[in-house]
């Protein structure tokens, strides 16, 4: 068991978090599983739900009040939550029975202030929590723009943000150069009379620029934001340590690489220039939309402009899918042959069989 999900540490962490919540003048705090990109998988430095509760599943949310707390999980994680999350510290709430909003409406004291980090929730989620707080006679309160997430403030051994090197996804596998993709998306924005689009989904940026990374488990993406304008220029906000001369040559003059801490200023500039900005409210953090609106930009709510063209697979991608299935089919066949030979001897468990299958797949990757 790693330090991040050691149940014996949870009481100490919960006390520290409640102290920080009180220091901020709040009566509670929402702890989602998500990071700033709203992805399913997050880097170790963004495992705030695991740090707070001990729960290491890929979906969940906790609400921590001054004298009680609850964790909300779907049916996949019922047994895992029982094993990882101390029942005496958190109410275990299956989502089929109790939603976060219904629990808040029932348990949040009248007049209380429930805090949230607008980097970690979408506008739709914020709206639903606002209704729940109103039903409780309480108030939903965003952290101040310059305030650290209270978990980050007390997470003394928090891992550093990932800095894995960016790699090129070759055109031979993508079936399109990133210049072709860029023109396609830019032309689509121009046709809709949209000046620019803010991209927050890491898979969209990886697809658009034909790049890959290793910032999060199981998904070869880079944690980055991007702004693409209708003339085909791109601002890419990413830790410079992830870049190499090869990547800079690949991106060329069309892409301006900037440090992540300049992202807010870039959004402000869009407002100063009175730009019409496409933003996907279903996937972008509420912070991004709030910053754009405050700056004076005209927010055009709509789908991420990369999602539809990304879904249309090229001939090269289809060939890659078929090749992957052939490799995986060979691995599975070897596994079934192994299982047929070894199972009669006994001693094979579900876990050991899964390990064997994974090793065969890795050998054939």
Where are these regions (language model features)?
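Terminal domain-start leader segments
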Residues: 1-276, 280-365
